[in-house]
Each structure stands twice: as structure tokens, then as C-alpha cells.
Curated annotation (Swiss-Prot):
The lineage of its organism: Eukaryota, Metazoa, Chordata, Craniata, Vertebrata. It holds the Pfam family DUF5575. The gene is Zswim9. GO terms for biological process: hematopoietic progenitor cell differentiation. This is Uncharacterized protein ZSWIM9. InterPro entries: DUF5575_C, DUF5575_N, ZSWIM9, ZSWIM9_RNaseH-like. It comes from Mus musculus.
Amino acid sequence: MELTEPLPSAAVQKEEQELLDRTFFSWAEFSRFFDKWCQQRLVVFSVKSSTRVARSPWANTPPLYRLIHVLKYSYVLLVCKDVRMPNKSTAWPPQPSCPAFITVKLSPLRDRLVVTECQLTHSHPACPREFAYHFRPGHLLANSCLPVRITNQISKQFVAPADVRRLLTHCKGPDHGVLDALQVLEGLFRTDPEAKVKLVFVEDQAMVETVFLLTSRTRALLRRFPRILLVDRLPGLQGTLDLMAVLCVDSAGRARQAACCVARPGTPSLLRFMLVSLLQSAPDVKGRVRCLTAGPEVAGQLRAVRQLLPCARVQICRAQGLETLFSKAQELGGASQEDPDLWPLLCRLADSKSYTAYSEALAELRSQAPTAFIRYFEHNWAPRHDMWVRFRAYEATRDLDACALVRSHRRRLLRRLSPSHSVAQCLRDLVAMQWADATGEAALRGC
């Protein structure tokens, strides 16, 4: 007796209509959505066939060449994996496979993924027990590169050269740039076995979220010059990455890169992660840091930062603080063509060289700026004036300008970074930059 395909119910037809033409701007976005979608319906799908974006004829043309590691596939056919265990004692012939399927394709504009076809009528009932046994969150991402059990196990830990080699042996392909990033780290460990690297993967996904990097050379610099640390953060670098660097100030007053961190945009508590990793790599500097200068985001992490660096004064970089203040003033209607003097006034406030000068500038600000901005300023900035006004700066008596040092480092960094969107290329550029600095220092010593 031949089984017939069941007719779709009204509920199934509605589900199909909701799923059709749904768009996703990355394979990771689709995978996260699809995990939840399957969990709600107790169904397991697997990839029957696929074509990678890198193999398409348009892979080297804009905008696709910038999205190869983001979109991953130009075509994917997902079929229902009927996980019911067959009854070996039955004499009936095997049932045909479940007809449910979903097709995802690259959009005509080649900038997103679209569900182009779906048939959601199953030939079997949902089975919670079998679903719980067979379903693995993140399997669409894991199938492309690394098993998520491995990435979950090693995530948030320092990795040794042997760990990187082990991860490489498990890699099934270059998806998500994981293979490329691991190869960069393998090359780093080959030349610097004492380097410190911490990897963080997105939970239940074979996708690198954060990489902390410190070479043996920069660790030596940090241990030699731990007194003043500067934090330079470049959010949204190349549109796809956040980059953070910790700089130490040497005896000649130069900012030297001690450690760096590459992360997915919007990674929470990145500064805390950076400092924790730094102190784990060089625990002897904890009580020797006297000043830490960072961006305005440090204000929201003060308690954690002061616990990590109990002997350090915490400051906000004045240049970055001014940018934040002016941006907020624009948002609240206090910086426009009608009020062109606000920026100079904020600059005078931040650059005050005495408490008297600060009080005078503050009184002027209160009389000129809109009420909404003043309320914001009084709540968030006035109580912390000792963190961002010049006359309270730690380095003021040492003839140093922390903001200028950070700006100089940023210019040098941007000159050396490639116009790439991948974690691997950013790591490659950072490693090359550090070795170039080391070579230059060696040449100077030889002169």
C-alpha cells in the first residue's frame, strides 16, 4: 500500500506564507532564527545540498566579495530529517522520506539570503523525545566548520599551540573565517611560542566572537612600563569589527602597544574582558598600574576596573569625552547652527587648568545649554569631572598628553590595517605590525 502525501492544513499554509520571502543578512542570523523555529515545532532539518558564495561567478564583484564570510551560501536545500527509529521487527516496506523542505537562496541584489521555497507538511508526527535526542543548537554553523561541542569547550580560555593545531584538525572548511583565523594564530605560535591568545566563540556556534592577543615582546614591554596604561578602542572597524588596544608609556613618553583585542561589533564588557586577560597574562603588573585612561565607556564599568586595578586612577580620554558630549548635545538639541559656540565652550571646560577656570566654564555652560543637556551633564559628567578635566589629569605633571598619544597610535594603526572585514586579516595585520615594530627597534639598537 503506497502512502500518499498529506494535504497541507490551513495552519501549515499560513506557516509557509510567513516563511516565504523572509530575508536574512547573514548565515549566522538565519541559523539562529532556524534553531528557534525548529525548537518551536519539534522538527529537525539537515542540509541536503548547498553552494558556497565563494564559488559563485559573482564572488569577486561588489558587494558580494565583502560578504563572502557573512552570507556563506548562495543556495541551501534543507530537508526534514525524519528521526523516528525504524521498527526492525515490522514486515512492512520502509516509509518514504518526509517531503518537508526549505530552500534558501542569495537575493537578486546579492546582499542577503531569502527563503524562496518551502513545503512544511510532514509525513510523521512530532516526537518530543526523539527531537530532544537528535536536535543540536547551532548545527547549521557547526556543520560548516567546527563542532560546537569543541568551540563551547575551549571558549573563553587561553589556547596553547597544541590547542590551535587540534582545532585545525577538526575544521571541515573555511566557513566563518575560523580556519583562516586559526592559521594566523598557528603562524604566530610558530614564531612566538610564548604568545598569549584567548579565544571566545559565540555560544553554540562555530564563530569567533573575540580574540585577545599579547606577544612575548609586548608582555615584556608591559612589565617594564606598567605605570600608565592607555586604551584605544576603534568601534565598527571596517563595519564588521571592534578593535581595542592597551598601550603602555615608555621612559621616552612614547605609547607602545601592549595587547590588542578583536571582537564582533557590540561585544559587551569588552574593556573588562581586555583587562582581565591582560592581568592573567602578566599578573605581576596588577599593583604597579597608577593610571588607566580609556574612552567614556569606562564610566559604566568603574567598579570592575577599580577592582582589577586597585592602585590606579581611572580617567576618560578628553578627546573622546568631548566627542561624546557634543554628540549628546546634538541629540538633545543643544548643538546646531543657532548655537555655534557650544563646541568651543565644551573644549574650554575639558581643558581647564584649574578648578576656578573649570567653575567659570561650567557656569557659562549652565547659562547657555538647553535644560535637557544640562540635566544629562549634571547626572553623568559633573560628578566625575576629576576623570576628564585637564587640571585633574594624572599625566599633567609629567608633561604627557594621553589623548595625543592615543590619536597618534590610532593613525598608525589605521595606516597598517588592510581594508578587510575578516577577523583573520585583522589579526594578520596586528601581528605584522608588532613584528615590524620589533624589527625597527632592533635596527635602532644596532645603529
